[in-house]
């Protein structure tokens, strides 16, 4: 994590709060657990709780290590923002690396606890990049978050990603394509998106 995080965060958040909503190029990552229902049918509730907490403990560091913030938890899903408040020219590549590390951490956990083939637990991840507005939404209860189509598309990609998959848009893939010459391409019809989306599965 950046050593001057507190100072940088304070500066960036102060700027955004003064201007209400600020357009910023960012990369959005959504990650959600897959196989929770199936797993709950094979192990006791107390053991399931331990597994989930172990997973959560390994999820956050993969994101923080790439100078990103976890903006919110939505059920079992997490929304991470790259390039705010810490700005990085390589924020797109960082998001992809964080996603792959997260998948690695999840796989290591499965091996440690000895999950069998029919006791599946995995993560589906969606990543998109572009300009978003950072700011507060709401009146009585204010939520500081990223706003815009980029967020929605990243969320929809996550919903289309299978367990163990990192699914990214063409905009993201353009930044990392040299690292993934064998990436699988997909034409995706996503809810709330009027056009077909070119997606790529990275591993």
Feature locations, PLM:
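Regulatory cytosolic signal-relay segments
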Residues: 1-25, 180
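Catalytic NTP-binding/metal-coordinating core of nucleotidyl cyclase/transferase enzymes
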Residues: 20-97
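Alpha-helical scaffold within the catalytic cores of cyclic-nucleotide enzymes
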Residues: 53-68, 85-125, 129, 149-151, ...
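Catalytic strand-loop-helix junctions within cyclic-nucleotide turnover domains
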Residues: 84-91, 125-144, 163
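Allosteric regulatory "coupling" segments in signal-transduction proteins
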Residues: 92, 143-147, 184, 188
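Catalytic/regulatory signature loops of cyclic-dinucleotide turnover enzymes
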Residues: 128, 149-170, 191
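Cytosolic regulatory/linker segments at or just downstream of nucleotide-handling modules
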Residues: 163-203
